[in-house]
Amino acid sequence: MGHGDEKLGAILIKSFLYTVSQTAPLPKTIVFFNGGVKLTCEGSEVLEDIKNMADNGVKIISCGTCLDFYGLKEKLQVGEISNMYTIYETLEKADRNIVLS
């Protein structure tokens, strides 16, 4: 999350996703792309928080090109595989977006 120390970034994203999972209202959709798709896959430290949000109606979308790039398509554990057209439409139609990089 953000630019800087990788360990700190992992701590911050874990804390952020836990916080989001415990608040109301939950977001309608969360989109994961680039290295963020690793968070939706087997072995992710935040997988339970993301699954909890999905179980409570949050749509989870992971970029298929990104999953292919990292060799993770078969390890996806939550949500659906999507493409940039759907990702663009989702972001474009949203009333507001929160972007983490």
Roles of regions detected by a PLM:
Residues 1-43:
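Conserved mixed alpha/beta catalytic, RNA-binding, or beta-rich assembly cores of soluble enzyme
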Residues 17, 47-51, 88:
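Short amphipathic alpha-helical segments and helix-helix/interface helices
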Residues 30, 59-60, 97-98:
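Short, well-ordered beta-strand core segments
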Residues 46-72:
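A glycine-rich helix N-cap at a beta->alpha junction
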Residues 61, 78, 91:
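Ligand-binding beta-strand-loop-alpha-helix segment within the catalytic cores
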Residues 83-93:
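Low-complexity intrinsically disordered segments
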Residues 92-100:
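C-terminal binding/interaction regions
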